[in-house]
């Protein structure tokens, strides 16, 4: 359940024991063990997590209880604008929020710094050795690529794998792109050479063979939506 009313909706039907945090007390990336409505209700685990860039929660239950939980959730949200949404909507939101997807922004050949999640690597806080530590230190000290946001001209969206050029030289690659309904802009995520990663740098997104058709674009602040993460922390 994601969106500004998600906490309000959950509070209508979540019961928590005294030993667990209430929904109103649940911090970012934390969870609570709870039940539907009362002590004898359906057992749940609710985490303050999501993949949308909005205030949101994820509800976990036994598979056999899922239909009943779904009905409770939809009934609680019927007056708050709650509607079902699929992966298409989720993908738009995560691109706007700059949230990475395996197979797009990263894979086994892309390090966390190139994928834009270098903050997850505990180089300063973990003294113990771990697999890949020495290599990650070197990669951080000598970055080659950087994840940036692009804003494209026109309404033809960039697709995963489209090349990014300055002149005839390829300097990057599109990892994800969409026409953002929230921002009303044509946006993309791009992994680009660090030497061309400054804000407002003008580039071109190549279509067809990368040369016959080009879409003008420029590097903008990343992520595109709520860069300070104020909504998810609200």
Residue map of PLM features:
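Conserved, structured C-terminal
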Residues: 1-234
